[in-house]
């Protein structure tokens, strides 16, 4: 084989390899970690709860995948997920609110930004709400607030512990005051849940901001968070411009909030189900003791 032929074969092999790699990536077989750049086999990533095995980066996941990770197989029962948002103000900015709703519904397959229902975690029953950031940034409108409130009332009536997985940009501006009212409505329902001596845990995921942080995300008996999740009310630049100070690099992260007493524990996604099961078992044991002493 001549030197020219050898180089030709090398170029051909590289080209075929490149085409094959691009084809596999286009088929969704591989994913690149946005944090460390490691290329991971997609099935392995899903099996690891969409957490990078190299650096521990928690990739964003949708509400249905979150339910699959948290609950026992085939135990999730949907509640009130037929509610659909409307456009009470006829709101329009660059685009009409009604158009944004239709687009989000088509792209996500959801009616609004939260799924609610009951499930079992290691055979222990629990009420569960999971916000979905894909739907208009997980913003809280009247339907999101109503669904969460109804779930809290259901869990109070059935004496169930409650977990709300938060992932939101805050109140939905397109619904004006109606969206802000959800903060008080949900908080009131949680107070009645607390009066019934029932357990409520919010799980703060990336990102949890705005009116959600200012209401039910911070009202838990135990406040859980995922590693490196962005958690805050106003944006970093707004705070810096208001205070005229440079904020720490880790400001508004789960780790920063835990250090300052706003988060009880940070739970990696791969350990979440077992951690929840342990907390639920302890709470159930304590309930039995209280009933026995009464």
UniProtKB/Swiss-Prot annotation:
Textual note on the cofactor: Binds 1 zinc ion per subunit.
UniProt keyword Ion transport present: no
Subcellular location: Cytoplasm
GO molecular function, one term: ATP binding
Enzyme Commission designation: 2.1.3.15
Gene Ontology terms describing biological process: fatty acid biosynthetic process; malonyl-CoA biosynthetic process
Gene3D superfamilies: 2-enoyl-CoA Hydratase, Chain A, domain 1
InterPro entries in alphabetical order: AcCoA_carboxyl_beta, Acetyl_CoA_COase_Trfase_b_su, ClpP/crotonase-like_dom_sf, COA_CT_N, Znf-ACC
Superkingdom in the source lineage: Bacteria
Annotated CoA carboxyltransferase N-terminal domain residues: 29-294
Reaction(s) catalysed (UniProt annotation): N(6)-carboxybiotinyl-L-lysyl-[protein] + acetyl-CoA = N(6)-biotinyl-L-lysyl-[protein] + malonyl-CoA
Keyword Ribonucleoprotein in record: no
Keywords annotated in UniProt: ATP-binding, Cytoplasm, Fatty acid biosynthesis, Fatty acid metabolism, Lipid biosynthesis, Lipid metabolism, Metal-binding, Nucleotide-binding, Transferase, Zinc, Zinc-finger
Family: Belongs to the AccD/PCCB family.
Subunit structure: Acetyl-CoA carboxylase is a heterohexamer composed of biotin carboxyl carrier protein (AccB), biotin carboxylase (AccC) and two subunits each of ACCase subunit alpha (AccA) and ACCase subunit beta (AccD).
PANTHER family in UniProt: ACETYL-COENZYME A CARBOXYLASE CARBOXYL TRANSFERASE SUBUNIT BETA, CHLOROPLASTIC (PTHR42995:SF5)
Protein name as it appears in the record: Acetyl-coenzyme A carboxylase carboxyl transferase subunit beta
